[in-house]
Regions:
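Hydrophobic face of amphipathic alpha-helices that form TPR/SEL1-like repeat modules
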Residues: 1-64
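Surface-exposed loop/turn and secondary-structure junction residues enriched for glycine/proline
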Residues: 13, 42-44, 49, 67-70, ...
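Conserved small/polar residues in nucleotide/adenosyl-binding loops
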Residues: 162-164
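C-terminal segments
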Residues: 1-24, 133-135, 139-150, 154, ...
Length: 164
């Protein structure tokens, strides 16, 4: 049985354990900075010569990552790929779709410090702000998964008589 929705609690960085968890995540993420990321369309990686960089706003010389830029043709390919996948996805039951959201929320919850660390580097969030953004993302997945289940269930039909 699914528990009632409850907002993801914020991390209390006054505790040694929380500070250490965040410090370790920052070290881990720092080791991953500077990678190059291709486009991914229809599950296939596409490398382009036209690249752009994401930099740490607090340290503009620190490159977070380099990513392939898409063309109009790439956008068209992505729309076609999404349309093709939709033909299958639209038949996936709401409970299965909701389960994807719940599993993603659980994964993000387990890796909360890591996701927050990426926000610290990529957009110069403070630890508290980054933690709040990650908690909000978890809340969105939990809430909309529950809404999906609620809306997929039989709904009462309300008849009203309007007298003119």
């Amino acid at each position: 049985m699914l528990m009632p929705f409850r907002n993801e609690p914020f991390t209390n960085f006054e505790t040694d354990a929380a500070r250490e968890g965040m410090r370790l995540a920052l070290e881990q993420v720092k080791q991953e900075l500077g990678r190059t990321y291709p486009l991914v369309i229809g599950g296939k990686q596409i490398h382009t010569d036209d690249l752009s960089q994401s930099v740490n706003p607090a340290r503009p010389d620190e490159i977070i990552g380099t990513f392939a830029k898409a063309t109009t043709e790439h956008a068209d390919q992505a729309v076609r790929a999404a349309h093709w996948v939709f033909d299958e996805w639209r038949h996936v039951p709401a409970a299965e779709r909701a389960n994807y959201l719940f599993r993603a929320a659980a994964s993000m919850r387990r890796r909360k410090y890591e996701f927050a660390a990426w926000l610290v580097y990529e957009v110069s969030k403070s630890w508290v702000e980054a933690d709040a953004d990650v908690a909000e993302a978890i809340d969105f997945m939990e809430y909309y998964g529950r809404e999906m289940l609620r809306l997929a269930a039989p709904q009462p039909v309300v008849l009203s008589l309007i007298h003119i």
